[in-house]
Amino acid sequence: MENGGAGTLQIRQVLLFFVLLGMSQAGSETGNFLVMEELQSGSFVGNLAKTLGLEVSELSSRGARVVSNDNKECLQLDTNTGDLLLREMLDREELCGSNEPCVLYFQVLMKNPTQFLQIELQVRDINDHSPVFLEKEMLLEIPENSPVGAVFLLESAKDLDVGINAVKSYTINPNSHFHVKIRVNPDNRKYPELVLDKALDYEERPELSFILTALDGGSPPRSGTALVRVVVVDINDNSPEFEQAFYEVKILENSILGSLVVTVSAWDLDSGTNSELSYTFSHASEDIRKTFEINQKSGDITLTAPLDFEAIESYSIIIQATDGGGLFGKSTVRIQVMDVNDNAPEITVSSITSPIPENTPETVVMVFRIRDRDSGDNGKMVCSIPEDIPFVLKSSVNNYYTLETERPLDRESRAEYNITITVTDLGTPRLKTEHNITVLVSDVNDNAPAFTQTSYALFVRENNSPALHIGSISATDRDSGTNAQVNYSLLPSQDPHLPLASLVSINADNGHLFALRSLDYEALQGFQFRVGATDHGSPALSSEALVRVLVLDANDNSPFVLYPLQNGSAPCTELVPWAAEPGYLVTKVVAVDGDSGQNAWLSYQLLKATEPGLFGVWAHNGEVRTARLLSERDAAKHRLVVLVKDNGEPPRSATATLHVLLVDGFSQPYLPLPEAAPAQAQADSLTVYLVVALASVSSLFLFSVLLFVAVRLCRRSRAAPVGRCSVPEGPFPGHLVDVSGTGTLSQSYHYEVCVTGGSRSNKFKFLKPIIPNFLPQSTGSEVEENPPFQNNLGF
């Protein structure tokens, strides 16, 4: 209808344009007509000639015709009579919607001269539409505690008619709880409200339904209806009530577990969560809670433990039903246990001994009595146990039996026996009773802890941090309980010189080993000790294992130059004749390294020289030799700096400074001091100084060597009882030489060395080979170890 109203507005605008146009061209008259909607096509509207004061012949002669702006010809003109007739049925609601009045504008076009005559056609509404509710069913949720007089809004009905034919009133079918009140909104439309006349009660009537009727003002009036459902929202104002205040049931004493005993049921007049009930035992004894169980949702009471008529003949249980709001009701259930005499054999246990010690022979495990209430053959019984277990049955008087062990048991082989004692009568049919017992074998401390390895090899790099975890040992015990709990300990060292307590410690609970202090490979290359594992049994059993700790060398010592001495005194000066051939041995740099292995492999190189290319240093042995022939252009004095570097990671190094003096011959040597003597000094004084210097240097060097050897021998003598071991080395590089004496060279190449101070060539004299002293090795070691040794010099 809104679309119809918009179209009508456009029609009016176009008609207005034509009217204005006609008025501008010629004078015009307006004709007003009234017609009821829904008239049939061809119905008479009015006489145009009479209304406008025209002759009928004029309409015909001037070609009068009716036009509209939307080319929709609703009217037709009979030029013979001047009557306006309906060309089609008019629907006011389609043409104008809810607008009132509904006026259509047309023009009568006449020629000679051209003239527009305005026609206004008012379409009168008839009551051709009934009120309609958009929703055929309305749902209202109203709390049952709503006060009387409360107002609830209802949906209004829609009526396409207007005016008096629109919705006029609302009614509901009579009821005691509600009435309808009519309200008018600002656009003059009427809408209904539902007023509560009587308090609601969910338990009395949880839902009300009635018909809402909308009436229009037409004649005859039309109506529309909708169903109104009022759902009363419950509040928790009712306590649960049981179907029975007292339940009495009977149950056989041999009922199986899980059997349904009885189902209790209660209801609650409330709704929603207020009517959701849960069932529980109220103030039930421990026997009741052990024997029975109630389903909180369904109220099913089931059996959870065997019944014994001889022990308890009946149970009285108070059941409580609680709703979601906290209100509750109670009922009593009496359960009568019915005795069953099935005449099956019975086993009465007098005593059971479990667990039993594993190493005790012929131990009585169980004493029991059997009986059958029948008589004759039906009362005669045979008692038996399985044959594949180390137990026997022994009969006694009055049907008493004892179950005994046949031989000593071994818990480590089998710690538990499930034994079925079967008693069968001789009746027809034969009935039998089985009694199952579980016999546990208690542990006896008959197994000592066993280490996972007979010996352990642990590696730790020197200069470690104190309290460093260096490894773990582990032992297991086949026993159980406290007999299987193992404590670890360090056993007293067999070497009285080994300070074991200050070297390592052990965690008594888990066997973790820790180095207590920083280890020095040069002082201690390895040591071994024994550890013990003791269980907590009585008496306690223990076992031992050997632990070897191998100290790995770290490059923590720089090379030390033995010759020439670098002690800040007068430098060493070597004399070289001018006639020396290439490769002439000037001197030999001697150095040692306190480390071992590749950390002690030394290489030599010339770092600085006064005359580059004149001298060279052999990388293997530190020999300083001439590289070419000497010439007159060469300086007489030369200063050489030799770099000594080990092969560690990172490498360490030291330098040695040499002074070389070129002389014509050795008969009259010339040895200047580091500071040049005055030019006027006599040759005799220079010779004296040179001899004194050489003697001093040789004495200092010899004294240093002896002192160093003595210190090393003292340290070796103290460390020798502790035991020394060397880690297997890699291949020895061809460009390196080992002079440390710590075991990095092949054993056949270890010699004592002495520098001959009186020789101008400063060569070495090899006095005697050093024979390695092998310590005996233990058998069964997991890691192949080099036998520890030390040399006479202690390098």
Curated annotation (Swiss-Prot):
GO molecular function: calcium ion binding
Main location per the UniProt record: membrane
One of the protein's GO biological processes: nervous system development
Stretch forming the signal peptide: 1-26
Assigned keywords, A-Z: Calcium, Cell adhesion, Cell membrane, Glycoprotein, Membrane, Repeat, Signal, Transmembrane, Transmembrane helix
A GO term from the CC aspect: plasma membrane
Cytoplasmic side: 712-795
One Pfam family cited in the UniProt record for this chain: Cadherin_2
Residues of the Cadherin domain: 35-133, 138-242, 247-347, 352-451, 456-561, 568-671
Transmembrane segments: 691-711
Membrane side Extracellular: residue ranges: 27-690
UniProt membrane topology term: Single-pass type I membrane protein
Subcellular location: Cell membrane
Residues with attached carbohydrate: 418, 436, 487, 567
Classification via PROSITE patterns: CADHERIN_1, CADHERIN_2
Entry function: Potential calcium-dependent cell-adhesion protein. May be involved in the establishment and maintenance of specific neuronal connections in the brain.
Classification via PANTHER family: CADHERIN-87A, PROTOCADHERIN BETA-12
Protein's name in the database: Protocadherin beta-12
Naturally occurring in which organism (per UniProt): Homo sapiens
